[in-house]
């Protein structure tokens, strides 16, 4: 059995025998599923990016309806969702990135840009195409897993590399819409702090 799957984590075995997705280092996870395999993830209350590299999955969270997502797409699962369930409709490769509850480039966006690009009602699983630089980046992550490289500090640096790549190779509108759950939460937090300390 793969060492990643044997490793203890905050996840627990599902009673219905669906495949439980391991979270080896709490930053990146990688797994392959055969077609028609059910799976579930009990994740931390942080934002996660799911990358569908190959295949097709039907996915749902505690706060949304089922949606089919295809290969070479990525999407954000917000921190309000603690459980993700799905079915692999084809043989599927998935990478998960625990992105945390803040993004370093939030300050680069004006309030006007955020209001014009964000939806009032954020669509769960609004997919974004995985472009070639991100695909190459993910291939490197997969190689680390295949060779059992599990340095948490390195994966932390790779997380920031992903944030750099998405800024470099995607339009500002795409980036804001993709990260809108995080940006909105950070904006609300900033308002609360400002109101408390300016009275």
Model-derived segments and their meaning:
Residues 109-136:
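Aromatic/histidine-rich interaction motifs
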Residues 1-22, 147-150:
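A short, N-terminal "cap"/entry segment at the start of jelly-roll beta-barrel domains
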Residues 59, 166-170:
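Hydrophobic recognition helices of helix-based DNA-binding modules
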Residues 123-124, 142-154, 173-178:
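Short helix-to-loop capping/linker segments positioned immediately adjacent to catalytic or ligand/cofactor-binding
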Residues 46, 127-131, 152:
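Amphipathic, non-membrane alpha-helical segments in soluble helical-bundle scaffolds
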Residues 20-118:
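N-terminal regulatory/effector-sensing and dimerization cores
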Residues 131-142, 155-159, 167, 176-199:
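A short, Lys/Arg-enriched amphipathic alpha-helix from helix-turn-helix/homeodomain DNA-binding modules
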């Amino acid at each position: 059995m793969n060492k990643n799957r044997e490793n203890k984590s905050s996840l627990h075995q599902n009673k219905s025998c669906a495949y439980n997705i391991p979270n080896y280092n709490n930053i990146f996870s990688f797994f392959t599923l055969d077609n028609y395999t059910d799976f579930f993830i009990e994740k931390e209350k942080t934002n996660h990016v799911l990358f569908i590299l190959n295949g097709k999955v039907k996915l749902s969270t505690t706060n949304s309806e089922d949606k089919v997502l295809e290969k070479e797409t990525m999407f954000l699962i917000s921190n309000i969702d603690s459980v993700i369930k799905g079915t692999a409709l084809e043989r599927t490769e998935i990478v998960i990135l625990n992105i945390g509850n803040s993004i370093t480039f939030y300050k680069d966006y004006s309030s006007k840009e955020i209001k014009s690009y964000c939806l009032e009602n954020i669509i769960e699983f609004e997919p974004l195409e995985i472009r070639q630089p991100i695909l190459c980046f993910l291939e490197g992550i997969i190689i680390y897993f295949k060779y059992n490289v599990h340095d948490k500090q390195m994966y932390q640096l790779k997380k920031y590399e992903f944030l750099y790549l998405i800024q470099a190779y995607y339009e500002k509108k795409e980036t804001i819409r993709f990260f809108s759950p995080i940006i909105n939460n950070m904006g609300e937090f900033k308002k609360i702090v400002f109101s408390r300390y300016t009275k």
